[in-house]
A protein has these predicted regions:
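Expand to "…catalyze enediolate/carbanion chemistry for C-C bond making/breaking, isomerization
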Residues: 1-185
Length: 185
């Protein structure tokens, strides 16, 4: 499938006991290359976890286009990640992207989008829906206000915004509907 960017996940997609090995495998794989002009974005573990510092130190070697920080609530979290990245060689041209997946983060979307080094936002619709205690709705009505708010913040700041994942990956018709909705926003 032709894509512009690939997000590699060291957070939710990796079991706790596999964090170190997943990190090592990812770094080795990315150093082999083979991605052409596709942007490589790496979602690290949250700064409040025991794995974030090791994630950052390890991925500096691959010089990713962006580091994606989960559960961003405010611009201070972006500044904290930037300060940690500045202590390592390899991040001189690396942007920071924010996972927008908490109610507090959504309310602070404009401040987050305007933070230094910000290059993009990724909607964490699953975690956001969980935090909002919403029911599943194929039209995503409970999430539309949050999606729209973040689109406005990202566009005003001139950064990229990416819609959340589609969970029913075998439902191509549903994927098309949700992708069209995301495109139209």
């Amino acid at each position: 499938m032709p894509v512009d960017s690939i997000i590699f996940d060291l957070e939710d997609a990796v079991a706790l006991e596999e964090k170190a090995s997943a990190r090592a495998v990812l770094v080795a794989h990315l150093l082999e290359g083979g991605y052409g002009s596709r942007s490589q974005i790496i979602r690290i573990n949250g700064l409040d976890t025991p794995w974030a510092a090791e994630d950052i130190a390890a991925i500096a070697e691959v010089r990713p286009e962006a580091v994606l920080l989960p559960k961003v609530d405010n611009a201070q979290m972006i500044a904290e990640l930037g300060a940690v990245m500045d202590r390592h060689e390899g991040f001189e041209n690396t942007q920071i992207w924010a996972m927008m997946e908490t109610p507090r983060g959504i309310l602070n979307a404009a401040e987050i989008a305007d933070a230094p080094r910000m290059g993009g936002m990724v909607m964490g619709t699953n975690d956001l829906a969980k935090d909002l205690n919403t029911r599943f709705d194929p039209a995503r009505a409970p999430l539309l206000a949050a999606l729209g708010h973040c689109v406005l913040a990202a566009k005003a700041a001139g950064i990229v915004i990416v819609d959340g994942v589609y969970n029913a990956f075998k439902d191509e018709a549903g994927l098309q509907v949700e992708a069209s909705q995301g495109r139209d926003m």
